[in-house]
């Protein structure tokens, strides 16, 4: 029997429902329970795949190829479960499926309404996503009071009636602000948020109160009194330097035990030693390295959420504080590579569109010519290919057909056919819809013997997640190999280039996939760990060069 924990948010958005849900999931998992997490998004897009990163932040890709909310990345980083397309759905997906059923005649000519048809579809999708888990944590996107969230809230209200309070539990996340002018903590926004939730028919069982500082006992008692929530169930969650402390903080306040008690679950004590080690390593670095992330969405760091977390994970596993310098590639186009001179390593992440492309190419050229560690991910690998073709293989004006359809040297072109990991041949062509038409999800990659990639991974075959439409053009790859480009990874059918490196460079790696999606704080990822180690080595080498003249004088 699956128990359901519904997490809602009030007062303001961006309080951290996803992190809180994932942290509670980590606690329950450490108590011996199998856990899954679902995210219900109230927007009408079918999925976030075609949304601007400035609007939505990162699109997280699941193993089975779904383009989902970035919160699923948090879920996978905190718990051991692998998310699928069933773990995230939107209002748009729900309505599309209901309308499809209506067109098919499934409702026998009935009038289709929000209640019961939309709410029934939501409940069915929740049950489907939760199937097989001891506990399903269901995060409802948006803020209580928003019109968009009402069908989801109505659906979970109905599930409480249908399943009872031994199988369902409501957690409400609210803001308890500190008003500096008055010098007071204000509980009124939380009171009104719970009042709004109760007007919908939902009484929260547990409150998680977000604040700048830990809540005093008097304020917790006041919140309990006015919200009809027992005082032990009013949890204080103040700001922390590392999100990986949160499972420990919530465990220490008894949240996991409180949940198990309310849901009548017999569970063991939570063993969070792994999380203690992660936090200790993050708080006590022995080294510092500066990494430039050269992209076009740098004004919103959530656009590269999994990437920044993967760099932090690599720092945890190398005892290094990773300082991330986000550099707009258009700024490099305007001001040149001067912006890169103080960094120890350069990373060019994925992206779409032609804006800022030449700045990324300059960054790749600067890294190649100056022996600076370079990590190109997805578009970042394609950028490295274009730069190498132009400046090492004498392919003047080489480009991707995404940016210049008439380029004389299309070293990167639309991928029209590939073999999925199930052995099925998938095809795409010009003019296909943008949504859901990319090469998506986990795909196997065969690594070249004696390559840097093979040494980093420690195995011959890996599976990594993809999200792209363009690939390296096999017709021109031979000329690039003659000039020193190494193809260190290929698709399992040998048709597609998955990884590249340079033999005459200290650390220059490109991959067509997104390794950041599978990095976790407890394990890290071999490519990111290798990249940070290379950055440290480059930093030490630079120090040695700078120290050399003074050493000569001493001699």
From Swiss-Prot:
<feature type="binding site">
    <location>
        <position position="222"/>
    </location>
    <ligand>
        <name>UTP</name>
    </ligand>
</feature>
<feature type="binding site">
    <location>
        <position position="222"/>
    </location>
    <ligand>
        <name>CTP</name>
    </ligand>
</feature>
<comment type="subunit">
    <text>Homotetramer.</text>
</comment>
<dbReference type="InterPro" id="IPR033828">
    <property type="entry name" value="GATase1_CTP_Synthase"/>
</dbReference>
<comment type="similarity">
    <text>Belongs to the CTP synthase family.</text>
</comment>
<feature type="active site">
    <location>
        <position position="516"/>
    </location>
</feature>
<feature type="binding site">
    <location>
        <begin position="146"/>
        <end position="148"/>
    </location>
    <ligand>
        <name>CTP</name>
    </ligand>
</feature>
<feature type="binding site">
    <location>
        <begin position="379"/>
        <end position="382"/>
    </location>
    <ligand>
        <name>L-glutamine</name>
    </ligand>
</feature>
<keyword id="KW-0547">Nucleotide-binding</keyword>
<comment type="function">
    <text>Catalyzes the ATP-dependent amination of UTP to CTP with either L-glutamine or ammonia as the source of nitrogen. Regulates intracellular CTP levels through interactions with the four ribonucleotide triphosphates.</text>
</comment>
<keyword id="KW-0436">Ligase</keyword>
<dbReference type="InterPro" id="IPR004468">
    <property type="entry name" value="CTP_synthase"/>
</dbReference>
<dbReference type="GO" id="GO:0042802">
    <property type="term" value="F:identical protein binding"/>
</dbReference>
<feature type="domain" description="Glutamine amidotransferase type-1">
    <location>
        <begin position="290"/>
        <end position="541"/>
    </location>
</feature>
<feature type="active site">
    <location>
        <position position="514"/>
    </location>
</feature>
<feature type="binding site">
    <location>
        <position position="351"/>
    </location>
    <ligand>
        <name>L-glutamine</name>
    </ligand>
</feature>
<feature type="binding site">
    <location>
        <position position="402"/>
    </location>
    <ligand>
        <name>L-glutamine</name>
    </ligand>
</feature>
<feature type="binding site">
    <location>
        <begin position="14"/>
        <end position="19"/>
    </location>
    <ligand>
        <name>ATP</name>
    </ligand>
</feature>
<feature type="binding site">
    <location>
        <position position="13"/>
    </location>
    <ligand>
        <name>UTP</name>
    </ligand>
</feature>
<dbReference type="GO" id="GO:0044210">
    <property type="term" value="P:'de novo' CTP biosynthetic process"/>
</dbReference>
<feature type="binding site">
    <location>
        <position position="71"/>
    </location>
    <ligand>
        <name>ATP</name>
    </ligand>
</feature>
<dbReference type="GO" id="GO:0019856">
    <property type="term" value="P:pyrimidine nucleobase biosynthetic process"/>
</dbReference>
<keyword id="KW-0665">Pyrimidine biosynthesis</keyword>
<feature type="binding site">
    <location>
        <position position="469"/>
    </location>
    <ligand>
        <name>L-glutamine</name>
    </ligand>
</feature>
<dbReference type="InterPro" id="IPR017926">
    <property type="entry name" value="GATASE"/>
</dbReference>
<dbReference type="Pfam" id="PF06418">
    <property type="entry name" value="CTP_synth_N"/>
</dbReference>
<dbReference type="GO" id="GO:0005524">
    <property type="term" value="F:ATP binding"/>
</dbReference>
<dbReference type="GO" id="GO:0004359">
    <property type="term" value="F:glutaminase activity"/>
</dbReference>
<dbReference type="InterPro" id="IPR029062">
    <property type="entry name" value="Class_I_gatase-like"/>
</dbReference>
<comment type="pathway">
    <text>Pyrimidine metabolism; CTP biosynthesis via de novo pathway; CTP from UDP: step 2/2.</text>
</comment>
<dbReference type="GO" id="GO:0005829">
    <property type="term" value="C:cytosol"/>
</dbReference>
<feature type="binding site">
    <location>
        <position position="139"/>
    </location>
    <ligand>
        <name>Mg(2+)</name>
    </ligand>
</feature>
<keyword id="KW-0067">ATP-binding</keyword>
<feature type="binding site">
    <location>
        <begin position="186"/>
        <end position="191"/>
    </location>
    <ligand>
        <name>UTP</name>
    </ligand>
</feature>
<feature type="binding site">
    <location>
        <position position="13"/>
    </location>
    <ligand>
        <name>CTP</name>
    </ligand>
</feature>
<dbReference type="InterPro" id="IPR027417">
    <property type="entry name" value="P-loop_NTPase"/>
</dbReference>
<feature type="binding site">
    <location>
        <begin position="186"/>
        <end position="191"/>
    </location>
    <ligand>
        <name>CTP</name>
    </ligand>
</feature>
<keyword id="KW-0315">Glutamine amidotransferase</keyword>
<feature type="binding site">
    <location>
        <position position="71"/>
    </location>
    <ligand>
        <name>Mg(2+)</name>
    </ligand>
</feature>
<dbReference type="GO" id="GO:0046872">
    <property type="term" value="F:metal ion binding"/>
</dbReference>
<dbReference type="InterPro" id="IPR017456">
    <property type="entry name" value="CTP_synthase_N"/>
</dbReference>
<dbReference type="Pfam" id="PF00117">
    <property type="entry name" value="GATase"/>
</dbReference>
């Amino acid at each position: 029997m699956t128990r359901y924990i519904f997490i809602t948010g009030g007062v303001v958005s961006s309080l951290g429902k996803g992190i809180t849900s994932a942290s509670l999931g980590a606690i329950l998992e450490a108590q011996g329970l199998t856990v899954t997490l679902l995210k219900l998004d109230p927007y009408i897009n079918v999925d976030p795949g075609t949304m601007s990163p400035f609007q939505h932040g990162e699109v997280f890709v699941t193993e089975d190829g779904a383009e989902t909310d970035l919160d699923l990345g948090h879920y996978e980083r905190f718990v051991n479960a692998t998310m699928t397309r069933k773990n995230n759905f939107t209002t748009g997906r729900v309505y599309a499926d209901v309308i499809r059923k209506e067109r098919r005649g499934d409702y026998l000519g009935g009038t289709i309404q929000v209640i019961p048809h939309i709410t029934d579809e939501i409940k069915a999708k929740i049950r489907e996503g939760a199937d097989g888990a001891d506990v399903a944590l269901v995060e409802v996107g948006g803020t209580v009071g928003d019109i968009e969230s009402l069908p989801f809230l109505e659906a979970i209200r109905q599930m409480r009636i249908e399943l009872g309070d031994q199988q369902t539990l409501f957690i409400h996340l609210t803001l308890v602000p500190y008003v500096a002018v008055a010098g007071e903590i204000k509980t009124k926004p939380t009171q009104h948020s719970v009042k709004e939730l109760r007007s919908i028919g939902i009484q929260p069982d547990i409150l998680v109160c977000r604040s700048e500082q830990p809540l005093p006992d008097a304020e917790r008692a006041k919140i309990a009194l006015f919200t009809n929530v027992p005082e032990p169930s009013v949890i204080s969650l103040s700001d922390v330097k590392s999100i990986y402390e949160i499972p420990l903080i919530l465990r220490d306040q008894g949240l996991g035990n409180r949940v198990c008690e309310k849901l009548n679950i017999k569970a063991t004590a939570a063993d969070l030693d792994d999380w203690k080690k992660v936090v200790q390593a993050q708080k006590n670095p022995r080294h510092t390295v500066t990494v430039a992330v050269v992209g076009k969405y740098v004004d919103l760091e959530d656009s590269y959420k999994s990437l920044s977390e993967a760099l932090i994970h690599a720092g945890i596993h190398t005892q290094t504080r990773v300082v991330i310098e986000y550099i707009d590639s258009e700024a490099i186009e305007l001001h040149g590579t001067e912006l890169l001179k103080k960094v120890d390593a350069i990373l060019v992440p994925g992206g779409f569109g032609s804006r800022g492309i030449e700045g990324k190419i300059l960054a790749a050229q600067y890294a190649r010519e100056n022996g600076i560690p370079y990590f190109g991910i997805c578009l970042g690998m394609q950028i490295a290919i274009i730069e190498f073709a132009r400046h090492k293989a004498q392919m003047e004006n080489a480009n991707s057909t995404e940016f210049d359809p008439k380029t004389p040297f299309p070293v990167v072109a639309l991928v029209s056919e590939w073999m999925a990991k199930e052995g099925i041949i998938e095809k795409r062509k010009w003019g296909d819809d943008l949504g859901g038409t990319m090469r998506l999800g986990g795909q196997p990659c065969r690594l070249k013997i004696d390559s840097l990639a093979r040494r980093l991974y420690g195995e011959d075959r890996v599976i990594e997640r993809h999200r792209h439409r363009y690939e390296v053009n096999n017709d021109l790859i031979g000329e690039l190999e003659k000039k020193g480009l190494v193809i260190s990874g290929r698709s399992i059918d040998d048709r597609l280039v998955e990884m590249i490196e340079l033999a005459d460079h200290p650390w220059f790696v490109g991959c067509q996939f997104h390794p950041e999606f599978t990095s976790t704080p407890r394990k890290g990822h071999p490519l990111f760990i290798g990249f940070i180690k290379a950055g440290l080595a480059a930093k030490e080498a630079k120090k040695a060069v700078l120290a050399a003249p003074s050493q000569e004088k001493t001699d």
